[in-house]
């Protein structure tokens, strides 16, 4: 019974990886919309774009690690 609950928890934690993909899409889409409105400011905002993508991906990686821990360590 406990192993089954760990697998369910791992599946729920893996949803965070999909949510990270949605977050990266939102960050990149909003950057593209802003760059199309004001192309001269796009070059100065590229670093902010990569920082936002890195934070969104980090959350996805943490969710993936939690899923792995629940699958194999519990």
Swiss-Prot record:
<keyword id="KW-0406">Ion transport</keyword>
<comment type="similarity">
    <text>Belongs to the ATPase C chain family.</text>
</comment>
<dbReference type="Pfam" id="PF00137">
    <property type="entry name" value="ATP-synt_C"/>
</dbReference>
<feature type="site" description="Reversibly protonated during proton transport">
    <location>
        <position position="57"/>
    </location>
</feature>
<protein>
    <recommendedName>
        <fullName>ATP synthase subunit c</fullName>
    </recommendedName>
</protein>
<keyword id="KW-0472">Membrane</keyword>
<keyword id="KW-0812">Transmembrane</keyword>
<dbReference type="GO" id="GO:0005886">
    <property type="term" value="C:plasma membrane"/>
</dbReference>
<dbReference type="InterPro" id="IPR002379">
    <property type="entry name" value="ATPase_proteolipid_c-like_dom"/>
</dbReference>
<keyword id="KW-0066">ATP synthesis</keyword>
<keyword id="KW-0446">Lipid-binding</keyword>
<dbReference type="InterPro" id="IPR000454">
    <property type="entry name" value="ATP_synth_F0_csu"/>
</dbReference>
<comment type="subunit">
    <text>F-type ATPases have 2 components, F(1) - the catalytic core - and F(0) - the membrane proton channel. F(1) has five subunits: alpha(3), beta(3), gamma(1), delta(1), epsilon(1). F(0) has three main subunits: a(1), b(2) and c(10-14). The alpha and beta chains form an alternating ring which encloses part of the gamma chain. F(1) is attached to F(0) by a central stalk formed by the gamma and epsilon chains, while a peripheral stalk is formed by the delta and b chains.</text>
</comment>
<keyword id="KW-1133">Transmembrane helix</keyword>
<dbReference type="GO" id="GO:0046933">
    <property type="term" value="F:proton-transporting ATP synthase activity, rotational mechanism"/>
</dbReference>
<dbReference type="GO" id="GO:0045259">
    <property type="term" value="C:proton-transporting ATP synthase complex"/>
</dbReference>
<keyword id="KW-0138">CF(0)</keyword>
<comment type="function">
    <text>Key component of the F(0) channel; it plays a direct role in translocation across the membrane. A homomeric c-ring of between 10-14 subunits forms the central stalk rotor element with the F(1) delta and epsilon subunits.</text>
</comment>
<dbReference type="InterPro" id="IPR035921">
    <property type="entry name" value="F/V-ATP_Csub_sf"/>
</dbReference>
<keyword id="KW-1003">Cell membrane</keyword>
<dbReference type="InterPro" id="IPR038662">
    <property type="entry name" value="ATP_synth_F0_csu_sf"/>
</dbReference>
<dbReference type="GO" id="GO:0033177">
    <property type="term" value="C:proton-transporting two-sector ATPase complex, proton-transporting domain"/>
</dbReference>
<keyword id="KW-0375">Hydrogen ion transport</keyword>
<feature type="transmembrane region" description="Helical">
    <location>
        <begin position="49"/>
        <end position="69"/>
    </location>
</feature>
<keyword id="KW-0997">Cell inner membrane</keyword>
<keyword id="KW-0813">Transport</keyword>
<feature type="transmembrane region" description="Helical">
    <location>
        <begin position="5"/>
        <end position="25"/>
    </location>
</feature>
<dbReference type="GO" id="GO:0008289">
    <property type="term" value="F:lipid binding"/>
</dbReference>
<comment type="function">
    <text>F(1)F(0) ATP synthase produces ATP from ADP in the presence of a proton or sodium gradient. F-type ATPases consist of two structural domains, F(1) containing the extramembraneous catalytic core and F(0) containing the membrane proton channel, linked together by a central stalk and a peripheral stalk. During catalysis, ATP synthesis in the catalytic domain of F(1) is coupled via a rotary mechanism of the central stalk subunits to proton translocation.</text>
</comment>
């Amino acid at each position: 019974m406990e192993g089954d609950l760990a697998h369910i928890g791992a599946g729920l934690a893996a949803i965070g990886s999909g949510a990270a993909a949605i977050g990266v899409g939102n960050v990149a889409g909003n950057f593209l919309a802003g760059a199309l409105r004001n192309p001269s400011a796009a070059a100065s905002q590229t670093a902010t774009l990569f920082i936002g993508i890195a934070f969104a991906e980090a959350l996805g990686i943490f969710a993936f690690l939690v899923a792995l821990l629940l699958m194999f360590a519990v």
